Amino acid sequence: FQAPVMADYFTHFSCLLDVGTPEHAARALDLYHALSEEGASEEPPSEGFLLSIQPEHGGTNLWIRDDITGDPQRVIDFVTRCAAAFHLTSRWGFQYASSCSKPRLDGFGGGAHVLDLATGETVDWIYTDGWLAEVLDGGDPDA
């Protein structure tokens, strides 16, 4: 008998959020640090994400990405806070990929999420694991 090898699960993403001005981008870093402190106090701590202002993306764009793995809900929370603080009004979205260090049936997938920044409401979202199971069971692929 050989015990199963533990697998590591990861969530990857990389996206931009345009906050309108370089001043907003600088203030967004403060919002990020506050959210990171909140995540660190959770049990278990949130994986969070990395944030920076990169010259190649312009001074108003925030580069949001995972650090080995990340938490899409933390990204959504952060973007919603930025939208409220900086009065952003467009739609914004990102996609993410779920992967695993070992071949596992539940180890791969992904999703996407679209927000209306003016209202902070979700426009639509999809998570491929749930979607695939539903369609394979005869459900509506567009539901």
Place the predicted regions along the sequence by residue:
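Glycine- and charge-rich intrinsically disordered segments
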Residues: 1-3, 143
